[in-house]
């Protein structure tokens, strides 16, 4: 929620799992948030430019985190031609 000045006043802002679109609960201690930096042509990270993925504990517990990361990275153009079992 925002106040009349436009500042965020919530103590907890829920996240959504990037793989399943489920809301990650506050007590989900198995969830992770991964930032992947954008790089320039020299291979150096560009400050302030990154892509954020949040994975819930449910996805990680099922062993689907690596496949989900590959799928999301392919969709965002970070990876090309990664083999997937679901194809």
UniProtKB/Swiss-Prot annotation:
The keyword Transmembrane does not apply. GO terms for molecular function: structural constituent of ribosome. Keywords: Cytoplasm, Ribonucleoprotein, Ribosomal protein, rRNA processing. It is found in: Cytoplasm. It comes from the Eukaryota. Component of the small ribosomal subunit. Mature ribosomes consist of a small (40S) and a large (60S) subunit. The 40S subunit contains about 33 different proteins and 1 molecule of RNA (18S). The 60S subunit contains about 49 different proteins and 3 molecules of RNA (25S, 5.8S and 5S). Required for the processing of the 20S rRNA-precursor to mature 18S rRNA in a late step of the maturation of 40S ribosomal subunits. Has a physiological role leading to 18S rRNA stability. This is Small ribosomal subunit protein eS21. It comes from Eremothecium gossypii (strain ATCC 10895 / CBS 109.51 / FGSC 9923 / NRRL Y-1056). The gene is RPS21.
């Amino acid at each position: 929620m925002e106040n009349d000045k436009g500042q965020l006043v919530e103590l907890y802002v829920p996240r959504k799992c990037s793989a399943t679109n489920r809301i990650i609960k506050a007590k989900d201690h198995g969830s992770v948030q991964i930032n992947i930096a954008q790089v320039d042509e020299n291979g150096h990270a560009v400050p302030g430019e990154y892509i954020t993925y949040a994975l819930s504990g449910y996805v990680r517990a099922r062993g689907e985190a690596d496949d989900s990361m590959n799928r999301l990275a392919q969709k965002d153009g970070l990876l090309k031609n990664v083999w997937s079992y679901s194809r």
